Amino acid sequence: MHLQLQYCLILAAALFCIGIYGLITSRNAVRVLMSIELLLNAVNLNLMGFSNYLDPSNIRGQVFAIFVITIAAAEAAVGLAIVLAIYRNRETTDMEQFNLLKW
């Protein structure tokens, strides 16, 4: 049984829209990182859906999605480490307070 492409695209579009909404409206740094992860998961879903639709015997989309997941995990670890370091100095995770590069 093959998963139909439109279901993958609808789910990926919904995830992408939720991620964009969270990215735009959130002022908390941890929520922003979670929204970025949602965006990357929507991209992964598109990669796997199109890969399955175009050539089910080829696994290029799945392999590329694994690379994206690996990069996303590294990005989340570095991002959370930066947020934790800023929280220790500023006692907040509000994005408006992250003005460390200002004079």
Curated annotation (Swiss-Prot):
Q: What Enzyme Commission number(s) does the record list for this chain?
A: 7.1.1.-
* A single GO BP: photosynthesis, light reaction
- Taking the record's annotation, the residue ranges forming a coiled coil are none
Q: Name one GO cellular component term.
A: plasma membrane-derived thylakoid membrane
Keyword Transcription recorded = no
State the membrane topology. Multi-pass membrane protein
Q: Where are the transmembrane segments?
A: 5-25, 32-52, 66-86
> What molecular functions are annotated in GO for this chain?
oxidoreductase activity, acting on NAD(P)H, quinone or similar compound as acceptor; quinone binding
The main enzyme category here is translocase
Quote the catalytic activity from the record: a plastoquinone + NADH + (n+1) H(+)(in) = a plastoquinol + NAD(+) + n H(+)(out); a plastoquinone + NADPH + (n+1) H(+)(in) = a plastoquinol + NADP(+) + n H(+)(out)
Q: Where in the cell is it found?
A: Cellular thylakoid membrane
The record's subunit annotation is:
NDH-1 can be composed of about 15 different subunits; different subcomplexes with different compositions have been identified which probably have different functions.
Q: Which PANTHER family match?
A: NADH-UBIQUINONE OXIDOREDUCTASE CHAIN 4L (PTHR11434:SF16), NADH-UBIQUINONE OXIDOREDUCTASE SUBUNIT ND4L (PTHR11434)
Its function, per the record, reads: NDH-1 shuttles electrons from an unknown electron donor, via FMN and iron-sulfur (Fe-S) centers, to quinones in the respiratory and/or the photosynthetic chain. The immediate electron acceptor for the enzyme in this species is believed to be plastoquinone. Couples the redox reaction to proton translocation, and thus conserves the redox energy in a proton gradient. Cyanobacterial NDH-1 also plays a role in inorganic carbon-concentration.
What is the protein name stated in its UniProt record?
NAD(P)H-quinone oxidoreductase subunit 4L
Organism of origin: Synechocystis sp. (strain ATCC 27184 / PCC 6803 / Kazusa)
Lineage, top ranks? Bacteria, Bacillati, Cyanobacteriota, Cyanophyceae, Synechococcales
